[in-house]
């Protein structure tokens, strides 16, 4: 196996985790799929599949969810960058989600600082 093939993840081969975080038990969040693509990321489920576990010094993960599925407000001890690859997403900030709202479309990118409560739909 070549060095590159060990570090390749094809979209159709992504293995989702539907219980990576505690909020997936909340009504409205139960259809979210999380992916740990490079590194273990910030997932709370130790059984989540890590696609590329080779140490890189950074993590890349992903989320996929149907319209109307809410990712409840949360914060991380890491910065988070979102790249919208499909659909429209609304990002909210603040503990209650009412400090700011940003609508994002395909191709838009946002960097969210650590310790900032954020959620998305």
Regions picked out by a protein language model, each given a short descriptive name:
Residues 1-57:
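A short, N-terminal "cap"/entry segment at the start of jelly-roll beta-barrel domains
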Residues 48-53, 70-76, 93, 101-103, ...:
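Short histidine-centered beta-strand/loop micro-motifs
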Residues 55-60, 78-79, 88, 107, ...:
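Extracellular structured ligand-interaction cores
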Residues 62-63, 73-75, 79-84, 102, ...:
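His/acidic/aromatic-lined binding-pocket segments of jelly-roll/cupin-type domains
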Residues 66-67, 77-90, 94-95:
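Glycine- and acidic-residue-biased ligand/ion/polar-headgroup-sensing regions
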Residues 95-115:
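Short acidic-glycine-tyrosine-enriched beta hairpin
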């Amino acid at each position: 196996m070549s060095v590159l093939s060990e570090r390749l993840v094809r979209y159709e081969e992504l293995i989702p985790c539907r219980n990576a975080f505690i909020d997936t038990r909340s009504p409205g969040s139960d259809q979210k799929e999380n992916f740990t693509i490079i590194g273990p990321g910030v997932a709370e489920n130790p059984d989540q599949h890590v696609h590329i576990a080779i140490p890189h010094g950074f993590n890349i993960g992903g989320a996929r969810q149907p319209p109307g599925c809410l990712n409840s407000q949360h914060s991380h001890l890491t910065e988070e960058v979102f790249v919208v690859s499909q659909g429209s997403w609304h990002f909210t900030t603040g503990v209650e989600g009412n400090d700011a709202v940003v609508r994002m479309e395909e191709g838009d990118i946002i960097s969210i600082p650590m310790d900032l409560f954020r959620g998305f739909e």
